[in-house]
Amino acid sequence: MNKEQFDVNLVPTWRQGYRFQFEPAQNGFVILYPEGMIKLNESAGAIGQYIDGKNNVSAIIAQLKQQFGDVAEIDNDVIDYMLVAQQQHWIDLV
């Protein structure tokens, strides 16, 4: 799937064994999984906070625009994140 074909009606969910949380020792958001930990940058952490198995990608984009303003890059950043997270097997898109 590429950016042009991406369906923003898909709902991202964290895959079994992966947990998103704020880690004070890392001073940021991380994804924990059995083999280790992934420290996320600020943008990825902001996106990850809205992955709850209920919000579709379109709703996540809308919430981020409400939080940060209608920044043109938000749409592309969220879709890029979803594609990478799916490719890395952090999330499922249903």
Curated annotation (Swiss-Prot):
Gene3D superfamilies: Coenzyme PQQ synthesis protein D (PqqD) (1.10.10.1150)
Subunit structure, interactors included: Monomer. Interacts with PqqE.
InterPro entries attached to this UniProt entry: PQQD, PqqD_bac, PqqD_sf
Pathway: Cofactor biosynthesis; pyrroloquinoline quinone biosynthesis
Keyword Amino-acid biosynthesis attributed: no
Gene Ontology MF terms: quinone binding
Sorted UniProt keywords: PQQ biosynthesis
The protein, known as: PqqA binding protein
